[in-house]
Amino acid sequence: MKTIKPQTPEGNEKHTPMMQQYLRIKAEYPTTLVFYRMGDFYELFFDDAEKASRLLGITLTQRGASNGNPIKMAGVPFHAVDQYLSKLVKLGESIAICEQIGDPATSKGPVERKVLRVITPGTLTDSDLLPEKSEQPLLALYSTTQRKTATIGLAWLSMASGVLKLMEFATDAQNADVRLKHELERIAPAEILLPGSVNDLFSEFSLAKNTTVPDWHFDIAHGTKALYEQLNVGTLTGFGAENLSAAIGAAGALLRYAQSTQGKGLQHVRTLTVETENEFIGLDAATRRNLELTETIRGQDANAATLFSLLDHCRTAMGSRLLRHWLHHARRDQSVAMARHAAINALMRADACSGLASTLASVPDVERITTRIALLSARPRDLAGMRGGLQQLPSLRAYVSMCNKDADAPLLKTIHDALATPSDCLDLVERAIAMEPAAMVRDGGVIARGFDAELDELRGLSENAGQFLIDLETRERARTGINNLRVEYNKVHGFYIEVTHGQTDKVPDDYRRRQTLKNAERYITPELKAFEDKALSAQERALAREKYLYEQVLQQMTQHIATLQNIAHALAQLDTLVALAEHALRHNWCAPQLVSEPTITIEQGRHPVVENHIERFIANDCLLSSECKLLLITGPNMGGKSTYMRQVALITLLAYVGSFVPASSAVIGPIDRIFTRIGAADDLAGGRSTFMVEMTESAAILNGATENSLVLMDEVGRGTSTFDGLALAWAIAKHLIDNTKSFTLFATHYFELTQLPEIHPTAANVHLSAVEHKDSIVFLHAVQAGPASQSYGLQVAQLAGVPQPVIRAARKHLALLEANSMQATPQFDLFAGGGSPTTVESAAEPQQASAVDEAIAAINPDALSPREALDALYRLKELSNQ
């Protein structure tokens, strides 16, 4: 960034020199709010002032005129700026921080100013601006199209951790937006960089703040050079990135933008990871939402009942962030999960969780502190926290060594080796940083005593002032005879001798009046003035020396960035594994078995979140294999169908995350994606009805699922007419059985679908059981073989508090509908191979019995008169004869 020196630009002669300087700076940041430092405030002018006033609720004022127009102005105090920056960033704004770098005492004209950093949603590193338990990545996006094939390159960087990743994929240009949206939802960037000539593929995405930069920033040759320089390499072959042209172009734009916002290089970005299409278990946005991994279906995340909040027993913010990442990025490679299973088992076996947890609780966010050290923006308490964290490493290593004494957990061995104490780094912060340093270097008291002789001497001069003032006060009282004479100090007037008005006649001739008060006079003497000059000079020099020393310490700490990053990653892994082990111990979770055969075999499985919120949870089995690929699930509303399906998906996902699972045993085969079609909601903003949302999600499943996918389909077809919905549900289920051959849990209220297993041997019926007693229903929540007999919709409505007159009317109408449905009317047979018409006579018998049962259930004998009872008996007779 260029320093803006006062000079009159062409066309700005009518502005004051200060406003000329401001306008030059603002011209370089036209779409960014410029916080312009003036003394103890950051000021905003013109349109920036109006916008900040509206967003922050601060006062909009005017400051004179410039070029004949009033200057609108708003400002915030510099010492409280973080709270205002945090609010603006959450609103998606970017802010350029323009500081005074010149000396007001020596400047002729406006003080020299410079933009030292630009704060944007994707480039945050300050702890006050970042959420503790989640990342805020910056992502750059670039694509090329040839012969209807789009090649899309992604590069993203977590500025707070220094993790840089690339990904590139080719897809049909017409469907590129679907694949791109899936990846963006997975990465969840806080800010997206786009080429200035943004195309339709990118323009529709509003998942984050979109920032456009010039097209030439995405030049592939520039991107290659930028990566070489950043990673200090001569080839990208070792990273597997040499042929990812689009991703390299995106990386070049990303690094240029990130460096420009920080005003310096990115020392903490030292390596590169290339992600591939088949690396993780695929989870689209609907699945993440329906399984409530890190936020509920209603969009709640903080303290909500999610899988993340359930498992997050992490003692460090690093561990919480890694746990969140694992939940969204379960690897298909079974060896990764199995290594975590072995580590968790070792931690549980050694009974070391409580000791490790209590030690980890005193470890700070080493990952983000390391980043701030690399950017030379770490504050004194960051370094004090780093010192405390490094001091815990020997204890943590001892615990890990004890847990892995059988050497059967290679991951713990890797963590143990990475937690070796960096003695040079620890020695430096132990010697240099005070035990309880001030929050800011400008406040002093940051560098420890004994670290620097010159600083100690200057501090001695300043600190001895107290004794000098006591001695001077004693001597002056004796010399003047004024017993209530006081020698004091304040920041405005410096040192002074205070004498009450009644004693001023005793003041010696060498006293010079400094200030007059209502009841006293304040004086200075040549001796006190000389001491003041010496003491205040020593204090200023001590602060300057301390600032210099602190900067030197930071520079020396940057030599240990790579080591500190490795330690941070090991600490995060250990913290996450301990949290998962703790939860498994408390809730009797088991180690899942990952196998190569196609199967999902779960015994006594439970929903991990639901079981934690109710007193007694009914465990259920699930058996899916090459012989049984689809379970048709029927049963009453509120019977637990959705909970059962979700628990199977969550147990499967947890097994691949590397966690133990809520079951007595679980054997899981290869899984590539998990799909869910659960619940119903309009997409009003997108102009889509409930049924359109349902069909869109169903289409994504049918087009994307494979034989290694797990598919959850709940109540497909209910958003349209009965026969349309039934036909679609049947066709979708049949396609999943015949073509996709995915592991499928298919819940439905269309009892006609329960005939599918008679035609397809790889399908089976199960139902959630319930017991009806009079007009009420008891849900047993147990999964049993075979189809359900009825849906118990009226009983559920009654439980929900629907008025009795409505329930009675519904029962009468239901009886009428069922009576009519028993008449032999031609209907197309969904399950017939041809198109010949057939009747529903075979299906009428159970419906007839159901109609009689419902009519009997609707009768309240205690409320009937003899005549009404006789009429009811005739109605039952009539129903039984139909």
UniProtKB/Swiss-Prot annotation:
UniProt keyword terms in alphabetical order: ATP-binding, DNA damage, DNA repair, DNA-binding, Nucleotide-binding
Pfam family, one: MutS_I
GO cellular component terms, semicolon-separated: cytosol
GO biological processes: mismatch repair
Name assigned to this protein: DNA mismatch repair protein MutS
Organism in which the protein naturally occurs: Janthinobacterium sp. (strain Marseille) (Minibacterium massiliensis)
CDD domains to which the protein is assigned, alphabetical: ABC_MutS1
Gene Ontology molecular functions: ATP binding; ATP-dependent DNA damage sensor activity; damaged DNA binding; mismatched DNA binding
Binding of ATP, residues: G635, P636, N637, M638, G639, G640, K641, S642
Classification via InterPro entries: DNA_mismatch_repair_MutS, DNA_mismatch_repair_MutS-lik_N, DNA_mismatch_repair_MutS/MSH, DNA_mismatch_repair_MutS_C, DNA_mismatch_repair_MutS_clamp, DNA_mismatch_repair_MutS_core, DNA_mismatch_repair_MutS_N, DNA_mismatch_repair_MutS_sf
Annotated function: This protein is involved in the repair of mismatches in DNA. It is possible that it carries out the mismatch recognition step. This protein has a weak ATPase activity.
Signal peptide: none
Domain of life: Bacteria
NCBIfam families cross-referenced by the UniProt entry: mutS1, PRK05399.1
Family membership noted in the UniProt record: Belongs to the DNA mismatch repair MutS family.
Gene (UniProt): mutS
UniProt lineage: Bacteria, Pseudomonadati, Pseudomonadota, Betaproteobacteria, Burkholderiales
